[in-house]
Amino acid sequence: MTDIYRDGVVVIGAGVAGLAASRCLRAAGVPTTLIEALSRIGGRAVTADVCGEPFDLGATWLHDADRNPLVDLSDIPLIDSDALRTERVTVAGRLASPEELAAYEAAWSGVDAVVAPALGGPDTSLEAALAAMAGDPWEPLITLWEGATIAAVDADRLGLQDWWRNRLDGPNRVPPEGVGAFVARLLATEAILSCAAERIDWSGPGVRIGTAQGVIRGAAAIVTVSTGVLAAGRMRFDPELPLAVQRAIHGLPMGLLTKIALPGNDRLGLAADTLLVDREGAMTFNAWPFGRSHIAGFVGGRRAWGVADDPAAMEALAREELRRMLGGTALRGIGSAAHISAWGTDAAFLGAYAYAGPGDADERGVLAAAFPGERLVFAGEAARTDGLAGTVGGAYLSGVEAARRLLALRPGGGLHPPYR
């Protein structure tokens, strides 16, 4: 590899991983060119406006706050969202009874014991591991939550090991301005926007990145685009990537979680930060998050893909689910959708975040360790093995670690203190 301090590094993608890598390299004195296909930075962390209030279309929480680097770096007080949240559980259009709520809590508390036997054998799907709960009326809701809602993929396609390794049990924090606005401000650094990488030539001693704005050269490149984009061949590599890297990319497909914001002129008797769930439901909702004037809805997995290119169908689904939970009269106080996320159809991402199917959990580590020619490094939420896969905190750490790998090739290379 040529000298990164002389010839620089090209970072592809100005999401959280790319921003973190670029800031780290620049702090160490490495000439760094950060390019981004979109006209903005932040990647899958982007905050929209709903009636003058923030609504995150993508990343919404700073998960596992006790070990999330963005919590440590925050320059503002963060909201403890767990302390605010209450849960409203319905069954067949009515509030769950105390006995049903007790059964619901018991079902949740038994999940670890149910999946424990399967964890010791060959990897299987989360759905198969939860089969022992079949017959429990709360099993469908638990399966929906852990699969489609949290992992963005249905439980029959989600590997048990990947689910187990990436359970987010720590506290959650939220910046008042929204996660997207927060990272765009906190991690802001120079980037060339509307500059998609189309071809990466790593056949020589350095790299040449072909873009619509011309060829950009460097000693090495950090690739932070989604596995969905990589698997779709939107970015050509010359020569082709090693087979192990290709297998890792295809072994980490993109799931889909779609969010919808429905403004309301009537609080419907619901306190702020009320989580709405239904035992037979297809969606979950957060009513009036942090006192804001909208309801945020979440749908993941196959249902999300099924309406990915049809916003009207997505809104119809959300309204029908709310009718199930709150009754038809409640919909009179709910306005038309203000925003619907479109990660599944956005060519810059082709999904929300990556998951591993049965047998593929270790592909995250393969992608993170890949270092073709000592001049290509891959970073992003998919390349985490520490339980932070699929999170902005994980993406940040991945970007920093990718930068550190390149810096380590330089005798005496090191990191500026804030980037650890």
Where would I find each of the regions flagged by the language model?
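FAD-dinucleotide binding site
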Residues: M1-R420
